[in-house]
Amino acid sequence: MKLDNGMASKTKRLRGWCFVIVAAAATNGFTTALPAAPVDAQAIADHFTSIKSMSGDFVQSGPKAERTSGRFFLQRPGKIRFNYAGQWGISVIADGKSVVVYNKKLRTSRLYSLSKTPLKLLLDNKVDLSGSRLKSIREEGDLIIIKLSDKSSFGNSNISMMFDRKNLDLRKWSLIDEKGLTTTVTIFNVKQGVRVAEGTFTIDYAANRENNTSTKSR
């Protein structure tokens, strides 16, 4: 399949944003800071992980102000799905073990281990803030920002989770890639405690192998 330069460039950028979601690895992000008043980071994390399922809309902003949007579904432990709007049929799916970035139109997919991505920190039944995982916590406007990393699992990657200061609900998160570039996902129209349709988080491993074999043979 041949794509005109404009369409090919747009598709490449979108795949890149998806890649940042699942494979971020960097060192810097927010400057470490303490809030003016004490904030219990573990209490906020426990509130977040008490929500076992949710769905809603999202807007993703890239390092060059690129924006895309879609729907997401989350179920603990370890499962999330992003369906990106647009003709390419791009989705990101975590099934508790792996994460796949899938382009339905081009029949391409990229598979990663969930345990090696910052998404794991969002999807665990409990956010573990022990050791050196908690890098900073601070207040900024109506948000409380908690920055986390886990060097033993995914190197110098980090994720900053931003919670509503009033009700402690998650509003957005930012991931940093290996070049120090930030991608932010903002969620809204969120419903908690939802029932998610069967198959939402299913990864077709056979299709993934076939897609990758076909790609290599082109």
Q: What label would you give each PLM region?
A:
Residues 67, 71-121, 183-184:
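An acidic-aromatic
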Residues 3-19:
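Bacterial N-terminal signal peptides that target proteins for export
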Residues 18-29:
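Bacterial N-terminal signal peptides
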Residues 106-145, 149-152:
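Flexible, surface-exposed loop/linker segments and immediately adjacent secondary-structure boundaries
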